[in-house]
Swiss-Prot record:
InterPro entries: Ac_transferase_dom_sf (IPR001227), Acyl_transferase_dom (IPR014043), Acyl_Trfase/lysoPLipase (IPR016035), Mal-CoA-ACP_Trans/PKS_FabD (IPR050858), Malonyl_CoA-ACP_transAc (IPR024925), Malonyl_CoA-ACP_transAc_FabD (IPR004410), Malonyl_transacylase_ACP-bd (IPR016036). It is an enzyme of class 2 (transferase). Belongs to the FabD family. GO terms for molecular function: [acyl-carrier-protein] S-malonyltransferase activity. It catalyses: holo-[ACP] + malonyl-CoA = malonyl-[ACP] + CoA. The lineage of its organism: Bacteria, Pseudomonadati, Pseudomonadota, Gammaproteobacteria, Enterobacterales. One of its GO terms (cellular component) is cytosol. The active site is at 93, 201. It comes from Buchnera aphidicola subsp. Schizaphis graminum (strain Sg). This is Malonyl CoA-acyl carrier protein transacylase. SMART domains: PKS_AT. GO terms for biological process: fatty acid biosynthetic process. PANTHER family: MALONYL-COA-ACYL CARRIER PROTEIN TRANSACYLASE, MITOCHONDRIAL (PTHR42681:SF1).
Amino acid sequence: MNSFAMLFPGQGSQYKNMLSSFFQKKNNLFKKIFDEASEYVNYNLLNLIKNGAKKKRDDYKYIQSAILTSSIAIYQLWKEKNGRRPALMSGHSLGEYSALVCANAIKFSDALKIVKLRSKLMQKIIINKPSLVQAIIGLDKVIIKNICLQYLPKIVSIASINSDDQIIISGEKLAVREVGLKCKKKGAKYVIKLNINTPIHSQLMKPVSEQIKYLLKSIKIKSPQIPVINNVDVICEKNEKKIKKALVRQFYSTVRWKEIIDLIKSKKIFTMLEIGPNKILSNLIKKNDNITVLNTNNLKNFLIAFKTIH
């Protein structure tokens, strides 16, 4: 098996009772990692992923921490089994923090601090300004961008370019809805509302990004031991200050996911392993005929991936 890349998912990859097959095997490693994370965020994350939150606001507040912890637990199991080291890592949005933890650039506890604040700031934004996130399927990004610009000064941003035919838009609720309708008239195959209640990667997030910047000043980030392709510049940054600046910008900038996958392919890496509780990134990538896509959303697929990559 040649080199492979590890990919880490972001918000939206959660579902009730995720990772259940890992816990059915009485995996002490998973319990230990979830207990550790729960202590840091002062909330029972294990109960959250098993049963869901009793209060909706708790789900919004802690689900990002749960997704981060899920990826870290799966990666630690991979390491415990002496799994092969990837040539590259990258994470989609929130997943960039998972990648940096697994590359030994950020301590897990520090990543939880950042993600907890990230969640809090996202919720703060929607109190005064209802938001919406939609996927536009089958329409050129230039057309979508031009439609978004027509709605200024209302804010609708391209949140993520996931592939040639899947663009995510985010921003003020009514404006996003109108942009979606206009995209449909211009030829989009589908316009799909996503299960995300905050205006991710839109200019609405820029005013609160200073708080992320302030927190990052107190956090040590080392040069990643495994190269991590970042979301905003599509490069493997090594410098602490530059990594921090990119993380602040990521809060309100477009996730350039298609370019990240193209960069990985340009390095002659055609095997990609998703480390997380779902198959969202795998489903995005599998349309590439020349790429082998593996995932770890359950224990069976984890073991298949482990065997394939070895």
